[in-house]
Amino acid sequence: MLRISIDSIKQFGSFVPGYNNTSYHAAGRAIRTSSLYSTMISANPRRCLHSSKLLNKEGQEEGYNEQLISKMSSQNGSNSRQNESEGKKEGKASSVKSLLQHTHSHSHTHMHDNPLLSLNVQQIKKNPGVRITWIGLASNVGMAVGKFVGGITFHSQALLADSVHALSDLVSDFLTLFSVQYASRKPTSEYPYGYGKVETVGSLAVSTILAMAGISIGWSSLCAIVGPVIPHAILESMAGLIGETHSHSQSLTQQATNVNAVWIAAGSILVKEWVFQATKKVAIQTNSNVLMANAWHHRVDSLTSLVALVAITSSYFFNIQSLDNLGGLVVSGLIIKTGGQGILSSLKELVDQSIPPTDPRYLEIESVIKDSIGSLKTDLDLKQSLHVRDLTILASGPNLRATTTLEVPVLHSGQEVGIRFLENAISTIREDLRMKVPNVGKVDVEFVDVTSDSKGDLEHSHDTKSTNHTHTHSDSADTHTHKH
């Protein structure tokens, strides 16, 4: 609630002609009413209509009070023009007004929403990553129910095991949905680089689940293959360390399966392959690692359904149950490889490993910077254009952070380049990067004299207080240039 101290109001009216206690109470009541309504608007716009109806009942009385305050302000303005000493008292009134504005803005800053998972139709339509994730989640629910019912109806243990795996995919989908939606929030003063690392953590979790699923499928297939050779007691003791997942494969060899279960497996392959292609397309467009990991999770689901299809057809036509187990080993190897690559990539990003110069993203940003600084050569009488000495790019989820060091040549006249030119250079580079590479966030630029020999000289100049080093920070808010 917005409040103004009694002393501040007294100071406001102490120098106004015609001020009395009645005017003091009326002014205080008007300020409290208008401040309350202003605070309610900033805190909850949806309740403004209801609040305005309540305040309208006192509109006539408070309208008189506002006219009184306006009259006192106009009288005070005329007195200040007649006497310079009254200008000091006018400053007191403006200080009260600034106090009012400051208090309102402080109250407004604490009313930000904190959306995590949202079923808002507008949010789903606006964010393609959220939309495709919800589609994948719905497909997982449908496939899990369909495989479970089909496994019971057609006596297919492969479909039953695949339905349990589909249910575990729901955890992956919720992690992806949370990561994509949370990472899309704008940077704040507490998190100036944004929330991109949240998506990296989500990618690590999804990749870990993917790798564990591959280990589970591989262990199940391995137990079924070596079961006739290795004693059953040894397999049971080893399964206790990993999980009793081999029972699905063993039970598959003991039960005959209805061939109609093939239709459910084939339908699952088609649906999951379509979701994989759609999710992969969005992941490439948005540069999202967690979406890419989830896309490969959908591909794994289609492959496991393919294994179930092969198991059903082979057991029905050829009575060869071992094909299911061999196919399971192949699929598990692919799953473990994909999950391991995702885990390694996420860990590298979490520890801020720079993007290699051969990466297409690096080459694109480097090309944009070179084009930008090439256009600056004609602005001044430079012997040569600026030169990119060093470029470092860090990934933060779907966003990129760039830090570059530029060599500044001298003028033909031998004069040094001014600060204004450097600020213009960083502004041009920043605008070009954001126009041509939309996922670039924060940009840091350092300028060094062309006479500097190496990057080590640049790092050493921070300690030796060199006079030929200019350091510039650039982000979405402002640009700061420091010359030493």
Curated annotation (Swiss-Prot):
Major localization class: mitochondrion
NCBIfam families the record matches: CDF
Record-linked InterPro entries: Cation_efflux (IPR002524), Cation_efflux_TMD_sf (IPR027469), CDF_Transporter (IPR050291)
Bilayer-crossing regions: 132-152, 158-178, 209-229, 256-276, 316-336
UniProt-listed SUPFAM superfamilies: Cation efflux protein transmembrane domain-like
UniProt-annotated stretches for the region Disordered: 73-114, 453-484
GO BP of this protein: intracellular iron ion homeostasis; iron ion transport
Topology of the protein relative to the lipid bilayer: Multi-pass membrane protein
Keywords from the UniProt entry: Ion transport, Iron, Iron storage, Iron transport, Membrane, Mitochondrion, Transit peptide, Transmembrane, Transmembrane helix, Transport
Domain of life: Eukaryota
Biased composition (Basic and acidic residues): 83-92
Transit peptide: first to last position: 1-56
GO molecular function, one term: monoatomic cation transmembrane transporter activity
Entry protein name: Mitochondrial metal transporter 2
Subcellular localization: Mitochondrion membrane
A GO CC annotation given for this chain: membrane
Task of the protein: Mitochondrial metal transporter involved in mitochondrial iron accumulation.
Biased composition, class Polar residues, residue ranges: 73-82
Family: Belongs to the cation diffusion facilitator (CDF) transporter (TC 2.A.4) family. SLC30A subfamily.
